[in-house]
Amino acid sequence: MSWLRSSPLRQSFSKSGNNSNSNGGGSANDRSRSGAGGGGLSSVIRPFDATECDPKACYDSFCIHWQQAYEIIQRSESHDDVLGVVTHLDHMVTLLLVELHHCNKLSLPGQPTPPAPCLEHLLSENLLDKLYEWGIKTGRYANAVRLEQLKLYEQLVSHSRHQLLVHEPFLRPLLKLLASSQNEIYPPDVEKRLVILLNQLCVVLMQNVHLLDLFFFSTTQTQQSHHASNGGHTNFIIFSLLIPYVHREGSLGHQARDALLLCMALSQKNSNVGTYIATYSSICPVLVTGLGGLYSRLPNQIEIKTVDWYRITTDDVTELPELTLFMNSLEFCNAVVQVAHTMIRQQLLDFLYQGFLVPVLGPAILQTNVESQVSAMAYFDLIVRSITEPGLIQIVIRFLLDEEKFDGQRILDVLVERLNSNDSRLCMVTLSLFDSLLSLNCEDIMLELMLKYLLHCKHVPISHRYKINRVDPYTQAVEYFLNITPDIMKKVNSVLSINNGGLASNGASSAAAGQPAVVATAKTIGANWNHYGLNTTTGETLLANYQAYLLDARNRIVQCKHACDQWNNVYRYQKLSKANFTGAPNVAANGAGSSGQNSLVNPEDVRALKQLDSLQSIGDSSGYESLNVFSQTSNDLVAPGTMPQEPQLKQQQQRIDAWKVSSVREEPIGDLDLSEDLFAQGTVSLGPFLTAIWGKLQTFTSNCLYVNLHLTGLITHLTLFPLPLLHSILLRPDIPTTSDTPSFHQVLKILKQQIDAELPDTDESLEIVDMARSFLVDREFRLVNMRKNAIESAASGKLLNGGGSSMTSSLSQTTPMQLTPSSSYDPFKRQDGKRKSISNSFSNIFRRPGSVGKNPPSFPSRSSNSNGLNHSPNGRQQPQSYTPASMNVPSPVGQQQHQHQSVSSVMPPSGLLIGSSRRESREAETQFMSIDTSSLQAGGINAPSGHVSNGSNGNDLLHPHSLEHGLTSYSVGSERQLNLAIGAVLLDEWLRELSAVTQEQCIMMLSEQVQQQQQQPPARTAS
């Protein structure tokens, strides 16, 4: 956990005064007790029974101790004299705490208040003031005396709640002590006590806001009396004393940030505090300059030791102290933007943009060295996944789209260009970054990347444009994606179906029906999974589980639609006049700050189109219920095996006009300008982003496996948006495109032809594909069990620190041991009670175990959610779901479920987190441990790890290209065939996911139509 989650700050926001009393001082006080050191007031933290104390005897003893201490004060200072005063103060505070304990007891109404003679004597005789005046004259013992005074005030403030703060004999010397601490450098023990006392004061003021003005103005008077060099303006001394400690490491920095954040929250309740912080304090410049300084300390080049590394995880943050400090500072800025006064918030955002993003992060991203580019983009991706406040997200988007700050080029355009990089590391980091940006669900990002190139709809021939907003063609697209799977995969699926008792592995299509008889050599397909102790007749792996794809797709689509409903504009194709078309590409260019006047439709129309999530009513249903809904709805549209009749379609369009801007009847082809479209045939560009994506997809069969995972995951993420214009090029094979590059569906057909040509339907090909599938399933269970062991180790308190040695285990045991650094830091974890699903357990299939390097800048292989992170981890989360392309790792929720399963029955069937939000996606981040590659070669499967710790032999390292797939131990097939087999399995899974997404998008649109129709008033009948 980060400082924000491990501190008492969260409780202090909502903790009442009574709770504070019962707790006896709060967590900060507890920390102060444990760190008091020897001697002094630390001895007051000894157990005592207040019920056995005689109040009269206590008072007499209190007076005697003070008299003896005062006699020492009158003499010259010496070591023994100072020690004697401290000893007497120790006993006096003990007696005061006993008395305060009596006073704080609950009493019945009408009963007299318990007497407090010691406290009255303390206040009436101005003992604290005399003690302060003596302390400033103690010379070389001044710091020791100040330390004891800070301990004294800390104990009294924490145990007396707010009673003492209203008494001038207590408040005046306290303010003098604080005022004299300004612009001073103290030893660490004095600094610690000072920050703890300031934290205690902030907690008390937060719980008793009515005391703030008294404290604030009393501070002003004290400052003026001491001739402070603050120009004579009012001064909130608690806040000004905390600023120097905001970037400190360890508990001291945590305490200071807690207290500063409480002051920021107080600024919402008291205008004086807000005005002081925004006008007179230096907190915003200090935060931003400190953030930039901490960023400059990060490694300029990350040492990457595995081929599949693509993002910084929470374990990486923990292992690198410089990165931990940077993330603490960034998270604190995020928290300040969340709770602070509007003036403070806006000032901090301006400083962050002008003082960090533009001068620090921009040049870092624009470096020319590939290693530096990878590091800078990984840091930027971490920043995007970590921030949650809309204000911070807005300035990040502004940073990406700014053309003036970087010599006329935009950061977003530079990132798009890097998608074409031949360096797999840079490409994977870039794809991961774009996935994080898409997880923001930001209108401006979508507009700049794609929508502004699609709004005119010139990429669709005139004769097909009327189809864009129609729903019924989606039903045909569902089977289209299932039918274009490679022939070898159809054969394998048929074999698996027969070997598993006739149960089809995809559960959704009969496309594989009618395949020729299975040859004898292929009868072993599927049987080699039994060594995991799983029932092969029940679909033991999430590979090819169509029901899980449906569940995952529905949840992610609902989540994405909910975010997109907040957009300022509705991006649906409509016939517009040229006057309206002129400004269309500039719609929503200002993002969250844009208004409805730039929309394609009126704000009233936008609000009318905003509906509840269409699948709420079936949100708790299974994937089979989703199939039933789809089946029933599609039967209403068109009878099975028949084409829809035009009168029926027109009648349906009349009933559901509200779901789109314009209906088919209002778009006669004859009214369109043909000349402009004819000249645009074959020359229309879909934009550099989609062009780069299509170009990368065309090299699918030669790409690195992990590049393909991120590439297909990113494309799947695009299909989740409720944008028919985007669906027209992704999910609608019935709509041709006139772009200057091959369409998405043409590329898919080309890939199918390549795989069919190079991997024909032969016995050898079947065996190679069987090996590829077995490798992916082995990988799935190995990673699931590795994370399961990590959770069990953490729960039992046996989790080992560091990562300098490797733990070995045989893969046949399915529960390899591992190491992971123990850490409480988690800046991406978000709590969310949303429904979880099984889909994230898919993610294990194509993720890898990592290795923990000894050198801090080295980030070994760790998987995290490639879709977001978010929300999820993250963070985030995150947060994430399974995309066969994104094949994400299991979420903590799922990991906890695996923890309660036996090793022989570890299955990832249900309960795992899917991509419901950025925050949830950050939760899905998983950290994998260091393992010896030589120990994972059971069953012919090699661990894809490129790092061996000091305890292992360097000869165990595999060739990097071999690490990519882990199939080098197989003697069947060439390397090209093995790569094609992996690609074929991946393509088959991805097409299933696209089919599921298409089906759920259709259900979503149909449900929306039904809701729109139900909300329409009934038509009036003629009288």
Curated annotation (Swiss-Prot):
InterPro entries the record matches: FHIP, FHIP_C, FHIP_KELAA_motif
Biased composition, class Polar residues, residue ranges? 1-13, 806-825, 868-888
| Organism superkingdom | Eukaryota
Q: Could you tell me where the Low complexity compositional bias lies? A: 889-906
Pfam families referenced in this protein's UniProt entry, alphabetically: DUF5917, KELAA, RAI16-like
Q: Where is this region: Disordered?
A: 1-39, 797-927
Name the family: Belongs to the FHIP family.
Under PANTHER family, the record lists: FHIP FAMILY PROTEIN CG3558 (PTHR21705:SF11), RAI16 PROTEIN-RELATED (PTHR21705)
Q: What is this protein called?
A: FHIP family protein AGAP011705
